[in-house]
């Protein structure tokens, strides 16, 4: 293993070199069921032809632009999600930490608007919600929080 990667996780000494659907293959060809999906960030399966084709098509058109501008495909996805979820609008995040940070901010804003003086965010023991200061504060694991005090 290399020390060039910051030791944020206790990495297992397994090298995955490719995937097929729900399976990961290591450098020796051994198959493992992918029960984590990139810590549930990309649960799309591996080497999914439809996903790969869609990504390729989009990357040949436009990879990314700022949310300072309108993004038609993002707007269409938001409309579709609004219709099937019953929610009023959507927030697109770049990571789980950013999504959790936004959820905390929305909860606080809601509490503020309702006149809650001292809002409390409830989290589970041994949980992990991200590496930002707010999500680290919400993480129910003192070991992960150690060294980052004072938390928010």
Residue ranges, per PLM feature:
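N-terminal glycine-rich, Lys/His-bearing helix-loop that initiates the first secondary-structure elements
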Residues: 1-89
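PLP-dependent aspartate aminotransferase-fold enzymes
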Residues: 79-152
